[in-house]
A protein has these predicted regions:
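Basic/aromatic-rich interaction segments and small domains that mediate binding to polyanionic partners
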Residues: 2-76
């Protein structure tokens, strides 16, 4: 396992860009164990200290979008 670190200014920007309750759309998620198709929508729950954007997805999943790996876009 590896530890991820994120610069404070990047974390601040993520939290500003993806506040709790905003709606996002999945562009791409790199998770070989889950079916997470592009276009799926969800509501942001919070951004954690590592920059993971935790989302309640429309398929019932609560996977976090990982900054720098997965791609989401805000749609509201």
């Amino acid at each position: 396992m590896f530890a991820m670190s994120i610069r404070p200014e990047v974390l601040k920007k993520l939290r500003e860009d993806y506040p709790e309750g905003c709606t996002v759309e999945l562009v791409e998620m790199c998770d070989p164990y889950r079916e997470m198709p592009a276009g799926m929508r969800g509501v942001v729950q919070f951004v954690d200290d590592a920059g993971g954007i935790h989302v309640a997805w429309s398929n019932g999943s609560s996977l976090a979008a990982i900054h720098g790996i997965d791609v989401i876009r805000r749609i509201d």
